[in-house]
């Protein structure tokens, strides 16, 4: 089976996350997309120190009506910093016969050279780079760290980098929904509407649990 992997803090999960997952699922004919909430992101502090369990629950609610969407608590169970390489190695071992498509924003891909064991990631999965507002990738080959650029062949017409492992890096435009989790947190803190920014079930959960009311 072809499985998409979408990681993030999901603080909170919002409609742009869901739309990205759906467009990648449709574009690459994925059997399912697995959402992987980060326990402790290594590149930025978790705003408000919202617990893993609360963020996990919001993702559960958000994807409940889509049978192609699943969730994994692999990073919560592992503890420590949530490095992508560790997660991908774990999933590769757990599902050795499946093919993974790791979904990342263009802003993250442009910074991939700073990730732990970044070069090894290309040996474990395909990567789908989704353009984000303000972080366009003009050419995938130019975005690669110099140290590993020789491991790829670039097919401009397909917007695809073929890696020597047999996996590829793809670039897609997607629907640019400029929705920010930090903006949603601030709106919720102020008691303003977050309707249509998050799924209704997540909106109700945030209100009922008063998740962001204390400016966490």
UniProtKB/Swiss-Prot annotation:
UniProtKB keywords: ATP-binding, NAD, Nucleotide-binding, Nucleotidyltransferase, Pyridine nucleotide biosynthesis, Transferase
Organism encoding this protein: Geotalea uraniireducens (strain Rf4)
Catalytic activity: nicotinate beta-D-ribonucleotide + ATP + H(+) = deamido-NAD(+) + diphosphate
Example GO BP: NAD biosynthetic process
Any GO MF annotation of the entry: ATP binding
Function according to Swiss-Prot or TrEMBL: Catalyzes the reversible adenylation of nicotinate mononucleotide (NaMN) to nicotinic acid adenine dinucleotide (NaAD).
InterPro entries linked: Cyt_trans-like, NadD/NMNAT, Rossmann-like_a/b/a_fold
Family annotation (HAMAP family): NaMN_adenylyltr
Family that this chain belongs to: Belongs to the NadD family.
Any Pfam family hit: CTP_transf_like
Domain of life: Bacteria
Keyword Translocase annotated: no
Pathway: Cofactor biosynthesis; NAD(+) biosynthesis; deamido-NAD(+) from nicotinate D-ribonucleotide: step 1/1
Lineage, highest ranks first: Bacteria, Pseudomonadati, Thermodesulfobacteriota, Desulfuromonadia, Geobacterales
Protein name (record): Probable nicotinate-nucleotide adenylyltransferase
Broad enzyme group: transferase
E.C. code: 2.7.7.18
The UniProt record lists the keyword NAD: yes
